[in-house]
Amino acid sequence: MKVFSTVFLVAILIFSTSLVYANPKKSGITPEQEHMEMLYPTVLVRLARGSGSGTVIYSELNEEQEYESYVLTNYHVIQNSVKITKVWSSEKNEHVETESRLPVNIDLWEYNNFSTAIGTMGRIADIMAYDKSRDLALLRVKDRERQMPYVATLYPEGLDEGPWIFQTVYAVGAGLGKPPFPTMGLLDGYGSDQDGKELYLSSSPIIFGNSGGRLYVFSPRRTYELIGVPSMVSAYGWGNVVSHMAWSRPIAEIRIFLRENKYGFILGDEPEPEEEEVEDAS
């Protein structure tokens, strides 16, 4: 009986410690920190038809002393700016597909008293990479002279600390084209889409326009860190939306997307060496 009690007590302690680690206490966290880390990195992504959300995930000086600033969003938010047309190739003697990418507009909000949106600052961005199957896209801001003032922190790699089910999460986006606002819920489960790509299920409500925003957790590092990109909501019947059953593209898929498209430096990877051209000796 004593052995059973001891094992049971150890199990309780381990479980309790895990829950505390998953949801660290936020004592000492100020509203200013919550605004700067969750709200302010959000942008509105505007196209000629429709809009969605985006998140600034990188803004640093490059070797030419110009600012490289990148915004993460969903592919379906910017898909109308990707044009595929067929043209005749006299060289191949057949029709071939060509792709063109139109620039998109992004709006950053300005605030009074931390929370009151008073207007936006516009920027133009180019579509640098996209992945239909993962529903992710990366935009680069054309403005090279000014650094983006607020950048989201990505959830670190290689840490055995979640995200876990029951962890408190925050969804932030520009729903319906309005100034960004947060909703809170739990990480409820894991799933996959029809292509087998992993998804997070959360009870943080999202609505139309939240796509391309982000899902946050408060980490043991006492910062709010991005763990996913809200992508879709559950529905039943004829378009009956269940906003508190929200699906997000997880941070693991985001890392794969960035690395496959040679943007691993955003994750802190060392720059890949350029391939040397081999001269033809003949």
Functional labels for PLM-detected ranges:
Residues E60-E68, T116-I118, Q194-G196, F218-E225, ...:
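Short, solvent-exposed loop/turn segments that connect beta-strands within catalytic domains
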Residues Q33-E34, G52-T55, E60-N62, V82, ...:
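Active-site substrate-binding loop(s) of clan PA
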Residues M1-V7:
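Positively charged n-region of N-terminal signal peptides that target proteins for export
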Residues D126-Y130, P149-L199, I206-G212, M232-V242:
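Flexible, gly/ser-rich surface segments that form the specificity/activation loops bordering the active-site cleft
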Residues T30-P31, T42-N74, V241, M245:
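A conserved glycine-rich beta-strand in the N-terminal activation segment of trypsin-fold
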Residues A22-Q33, V82-N113, L226-S282:
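C-terminal cap/linker of serine protease catalytic domains
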Residues V7-S16:
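Bacterial N-terminal signal peptides
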Residues T55, P205-P230:
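Catalytic nucleophile loop of clan PA
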